[in-house]
Amino acid sequence: DIESLKKNLDRATKMAEKTGGGILVISEGVFGMRGEQGRLKEIAAIKSEYNFRFLVDDAHGFGTLGATGAGAGEEQGIQDEIDVYFATFAKSMASTGAFIAADKEIIDFMKYNMRSQMFAKSLQSVLVAGALKRLDMLRSRPELKEKLWQNVNALQSGLKKRGFDIGSTQSCVTPVYLMGSIPEAMVLVKDLREKHSIFCSIVVYPVIPKGIILLRLIPTTTHTLEDVTLTLDAFDVIRERLEGGIYKRMSAGIVAS
């Protein structure tokens, strides 16, 4: 809500003027539950009206969005307006660790003032080497991202055609919204895993309203269009079982036992 942000910036500006402090606006590049992109372009547009620094946590955007995979900022054409860019090696790079990119002044301040930096061990060299290799692959093998988006588009368009609600995702994160209880959701994902060889995470109350099940899918480059079709067929099956009350009866039996 940009209007709400402006009101908060008005208040923050008055406080900063009194205390001599500064203002940091933080947004996610991609919201991990719903897959929607942050309104980075609109936030960047008001930097001329307010004196603030802009931090973007782009865990799900880095490596998957933008012409070169630089993330949601590049996708929205405002990468140079981001003052502090944070992302992880655990998503698109399938590894461990994370990084912060910023001006040297900011990096030096963090390096010598952050508790987590001072009292933490360095990232293992094998993970650093792996991250550098994956960065090189992002730059030199654009076909990997193209294949990823081929799979993403096939999955998301296929789900929509089959009548599934996937919200308004703008990324690889593919949420599927179903109606059901937490016990039903637990039986459902077990069914997906054991009968269809599909692993996905569930999100339930209190993260989302009661009575809603959110299944969160994220395709990869190594998946095939055949995998996508199998997934779509599996979701048809689990929806039928959910709406037919099968998971409700199964979950009731588990609770009773």
Where are the regions a protein language model picked out?
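A common structural junction motif
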Residues: E194-F199, F235-E243
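Active-site phosphate-binding strand-loop segment of PLP-dependent enzymes
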Residues: D1-L55
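Pyridoxal 5′-phosphate
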Residues: D1-I2, M15, T19, I23-S27, ...
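Conserved PLP-binding catalytic core of the aspartate aminotransferase-like
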Residues: R141, K145-Q156, K160-H196, Y205, ...
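Short beta-strand
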Residues: A16, I23, F86, A120-K121, ...
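Conserved core segment of the aminotransferase class I/II
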Residues: V84-F86, M93-P142
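Conserved active-site segment immediately N-terminal to the catalytic lysine
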Residues: N51, G71-F89, D108, Y112
